[in-house]
Structure formats: C-alpha cells, structure tokens
C-alpha cells in the first residue's frame, strides 16, 4: 500500500522555529502527526518543499493530489510564498483564494492561509487565527479566553 489509508488532506502549522503536520481524513479526524525544528527561520525558499516532504512523504499516495493547508509564518514575506495579511473584519476566503506556492512534487496541492491584521489597536496574527477557527468549528458555543503562546 502506498500512502496513508483514508488520507483526505494535510494540515500544517509552520512557524518561525517549528513545523507541525497532521494527516486528516474526510471527517477532519487526525490520522497521524509529525513535527520538526525546520521552522521558517531556518529555511530559504528552496528548502520548504523538502522540509515538508521529510514529514509527509510517507503519507502521500503514489498518484493523485492531496490538499495541504498551511498557516503561520510560511505565508510571511520571508516564507515559502507570501499570503498578505487581510484586514479585519473580513469574510472567510472562498475556495481557491489562498496563496499557492509552486511545488515539484505533483501530489502536493499546497495552499497558504493569510494572516489577519487590525489597525486600532495595531496587531496581527499569522497562524493563530487558523487554530482559533478550528476550535470554533468543533466547539461553536465556546465562550472563554484562548491563550496561544508562540516562540517570539
């Protein structure tokens, strides 16, 4: 058997210092996960795809394309492909509106989620908003405070 059985898509949280990946099925259940210290800050543009493939290569089928949805510093100016910040408030992106880096491996359909920014008070998020959206999708009645510490 080639690849991870029931793999539907791959979630990626790619920060400055760490890379984390999750294999997901069609119901968004986690099938497997991995991580490395190959954060955006350790790579040049040519290094992103190889770093990702070191973690997910064994999950991919021999043929076909797998959606890979990435958030975090991977979408910064210094990242794999720039996904410019979106001003808030904003509506969710429609399918196909995320940044797409070029890939050599034809099995990868990588999309990078943009960060969010507000002017008053000035602040930005790149990756955290995606994690919050995931929590709210699973717990729509959540009423509390979230603390998502990063490495900088």
Question: What annotation goes with each model-predicted range?
Answer:
Residues 59-125:
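Short beta-strand-loop/turn "lid" adjacent to the catalytic site in phosphate-handling enzymes
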Residues 2-6, 107-145:
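Conserved phosphate-binding catalytic cores of ATP/NTP-utilizing and phosphoryl-transfer enzymes
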Residues 12-18, 73, 148-152:
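A short acidic Gly-Thr/Ser loop motif
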Residues 26-29, 61-62, 137-145:
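Secondary-structure boundary elements
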Residues 9-47:
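Short glycine-rich, Thr/Ser-proximal phosphate-binding strand/loop in the N-terminal lobe
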Residues 46-59:
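Short, well-ordered amphipathic alpha-helical segments that serve as non-catalytic structural scaffolds
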Residues 27, 52-53, 66-69:
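Non-catalytic, solvent-exposed interaction/assembly segments
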């Amino acid at each position: 058997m080639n690849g991870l059985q029931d793999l539907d898509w791959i979630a990626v949280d790619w920060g400055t210092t760490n890379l984390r990946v999750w294999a997901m099925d069609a119901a968004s259940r986690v099938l497997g996960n991995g991580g490395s210290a190959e954060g955006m800050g350790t790579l040049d543009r040519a290094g992103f795809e190889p770093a990702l493939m070191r973690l997910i290569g064994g999950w991919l089928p021999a043929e076909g394309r797998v959606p890979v949805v990435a958030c975090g510093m991977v979408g910064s100016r210094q990242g794999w492909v720039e996904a410019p910040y979106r001003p808030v408030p904003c509506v969710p992106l429609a399918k196909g509106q995320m940044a797409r880096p070029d890939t050599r491996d034809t099995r990868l359909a990588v999309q990078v989620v943009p960060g969010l920014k507000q002017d008053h008070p000035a602040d930005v998020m790149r990756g955290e908003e995606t994690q919050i959206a995931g929590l709210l999708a699973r717990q729509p009645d959540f009423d509390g405070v979230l603390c998502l510490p990063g490495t900088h």
